């Protein structure tokens, strides 16, 4: 049996925060604002996984009103989500992600993001795809006000 899930996340770019996407710290003059480390890609992946097993979203599991998640490492949050997926008897079939950002360029960091995510989801590198695009200077991402990410996951019964 297969289950599919879709995730989407967006965070505002601000000064004074590190930029962490896909578990990679990217050198840039701005970072993403959020209660946790605001890793927009890992949040989208977590939401996709939760959606695939019908378990809500990351806001339900890791509320921003709970101080224990303040500045939390999103990789640890995704690891907890993956434990829920495994408890339901599923494993990764494949994952496809898109980062939407005008700047900075993501290409130099994509392979490390893929490796990080494959490790977190206990999968092979060939099961994970990460790509990036711009909005051609349109909208909030085009104006460099924020970064968005989308993820689609396919899970299969073990």
Swiss-Prot record:
Q: Report whether Cell membrane shows up as a keyword of the record.
A: no
The reaction(s) this protein catalyses: 4-CDP-2-C-methyl-D-erythritol 2-phosphate = 2-C-methyl-D-erythritol 2,4-cyclic diphosphate + CMP
The biological pathway it contributes to is: Isoprenoid biosynthesis; isopentenyl diphosphate biosynthesis via DXP pathway; isopentenyl diphosphate from 1-deoxy-D-xylulose 5-phosphate: step 4/6
Q: Where is this site: Transition state stabilizer?
A: 35, 134
In alphabetical order, the GO MF annotations are:
2-C-methyl-D-erythritol 2,4-cyclodiphosphate synthase activity; metal ion binding
Enzyme Commission code(s) on record: 4.6.1.12
> What InterPro entries does the annotation carry?
MECDP_synthase (IPR003526), MECDP_synthase_CS (IPR020555), MECDP_synthase_sf (IPR036571)
Q: Which cofactor does it need?
A: a divalent metal cation
Which one GO biological process term can you cite for this protein?
Answer: terpenoid biosynthetic process
Assembly, in brief, is:
Homotrimer.
Q: Report the protein's function.
A: Involved in the biosynthesis of isopentenyl diphosphate (IPP) and dimethylallyl diphosphate (DMAPP), two major building blocks of isoprenoid compounds. Catalyzes the conversion of 4-diphosphocytidyl-2-C-methyl-D-erythritol 2-phosphate (CDP-ME2P) to 2-C-methyl-D-erythritol 2,4-cyclodiphosphate (ME-CPP) with a corresponding release of cytidine 5-monophosphate (CMP).
What name does UniProt use for this protein? 2-C-methyl-D-erythritol 2,4-cyclodiphosphate synthase
Organism from which the protein derives: Geobacillus sp. (strain WCH70)
Give the source lineage, highest ranks first. Answer: Bacteria, Bacillati, Bacillota, Bacilli, Bacillales
The coding gene here is ispF
């Amino acid at each position: 049996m297969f289950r599919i899930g879709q995730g989407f996340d967006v965070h505002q770019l601000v000064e004074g925060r590190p930029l962490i996407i896909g578990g990679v710290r990217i050198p840039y003059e701005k970072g993403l604002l959020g209660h946790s480390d605001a890793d927009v890609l890992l949040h989208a992946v977590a939401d996709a996984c939760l959606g695939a097993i019908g378990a809500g979203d990351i806001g339900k599991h890791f509320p921003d009103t709970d101080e224990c998640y303040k500045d939390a490492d999103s990789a640890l949050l995704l690891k907890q989500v993956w434990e829920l997926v495994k408890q339901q008897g599923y494993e990764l079939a494949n994952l496809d992600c898109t980062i939407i950002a005008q700047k900075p360029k993501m290409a130099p960091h994509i392979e490390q993001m893929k490796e990080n995510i494959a490790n977190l989801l206990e999968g092979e590198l060939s099961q994970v795809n990460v790509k990036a695009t711009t909005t051609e200077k349109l909208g909030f991402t085009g104006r460099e006000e924020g970064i968005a990410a989308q993820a689609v996951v396919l899970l299969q019964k073990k």
